[in-house]
């Protein structure tokens, strides 16, 4: 905000997600409180724009927050601004920083170099969510000084059977794998078809699924035993059809 309060807001402007208009940076925190958040259908909610530190406190011991530094891969952002954004994160995470007392933060990083920048500045109280969707990615992180216990592996949009050797290596190191379906199964409009799509995602067995609709997974099988039973049923059906 204009008075240097960090708030939770997806965009640089408040137009899309609130009843107001303009850039976040043009308002003080108190001025932002005159607006309400709106849902994806533009329905006005009673909720206000929250401060980041209030959300961190609310989520302590029950939520893992994924901090995604968008300055790193945004076109037109200078190297100076990128470095400043990294240094800001480091300042907040180092002892005495506003985020340092929270141990439920995961940082999305886009390269070994970015992860190492945090690591070499002594950041040890977060997990790193990194893309590992090839054997080359695995080897790069395996050769880095960052222990695997600090790594969450983003394996892109879906489980790829051709990359099972990579997944096996990750699991052998105790690393969990995560897919993102916000641009695929989440986009299926028909509720029945979307539920079928979610079942397919579950049967593929990523460890974590990133979705915009977590509530729609309620009632779906999520335990390994239940998922394995679905896999076996699908295989039996396939064999029957072949006959």
Where are these regions (language model features)?
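Asp-based phosphoryl-transfer active-site loop
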Residues: 1-2
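C-terminal active-site rim and adjoining tail of enzyme catalytic domains
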Residues: 129-243
